[in-house]
Curated annotation (Swiss-Prot):
Gene Ontology, cellular component aspect: ribonucleoprotein complex; ribosome
Organism encoding this protein: Synechococcus sp. (strain JA-3-3Ab)
GO BP annotations listed: translation
Protein name as annotated: Large ribosomal subunit protein bL31
Keyword annotations of the record: Ribonucleoprotein, Ribosomal protein, RNA-binding, rRNA-binding
A single MF term (Gene Ontology): structural constituent of ribosome
The keyword Transmembrane helix appears for this protein: no
Length: 73
């Protein structure tokens, strides 16, 4: 028989709070979860992410290893 009283209390409607606002509910062992970032305000998921690559990785590699001027035959 399983022991009683050894498992934490389960909250099926735990509130996820970001910047003082309830953004979703999930199941958890805590009644409230406070987060700094969630999918609703993360730049990757909102599409506001801007990739700034002033020098391409391939160009940087070619310059670093001296392969910039010669082409393979």
């Amino acid at each position: 028989m399983p022991k009683k009283g050894i498992h934490p209390q389960w909250y099926p409607e735990a509130k996820v709070i970001c910047n003082g606002e309830v953004v979703m509910t999930v199941g958890s062992t805590k009644p409230e979860l406070k987060v700094d970032v969630w999918s609703g305000n993360h730049p990757f998921f909102t599409g506001s992410q801007k990739i700034i690559d002033s020098e391409g990785r391939v160009d940087k590699f070619m310059r670093k290893y001296g392969m910039g001027g010669k082409k393979a035959r």
